[in-house]
Amino acid sequence: MSLFDFFKNKGSAATATDRLKLILAKERTLNLPYMEEMRKEIIAVIQKYTKSSDIHFKTIDGNQSVETIEVEIILPK
């Protein structure tokens, strides 16, 4: 593969394959069986150290294979 091949347009089959990979990666990350248990454990640890019950999770789309979960914690005064 040369440097010029890098900038060459992909064919429709390659583009379709890449799109399918994106869809499968997204579906795989959404259906992980341990995600709900992990969220509960994270909430328990946060509550143990902060005494906060106002905890929110938000899913943020990352790159092709990574999905980010943002945790928002409202601390009591």
UniProtKB/Swiss-Prot annotation:
As for family, the record states: Belongs to the MinE family.
Q: Which domain of life does the UniProt lineage start with?
A: Bacteria
Question: Keywords for this entry?
Answer: Cell cycle, Cell division
Q: Which Pfam families match?
A: MinE (PF03776)
InterPro entries xref list? MinE, MinE_sf
Q: Which GO terms describe its biological process?
A: cell division; regulation of division septum assembly
Q: What does this protein do?
A: Prevents the cell division inhibition by proteins MinC and MinD at internal division sites while permitting inhibition at polar sites. This ensures cell division at the proper site by restricting the formation of a division septum at the midpoint of the long axis of the cell.
User: What is this protein's record name?
Assistant: Cell division topological specificity factor
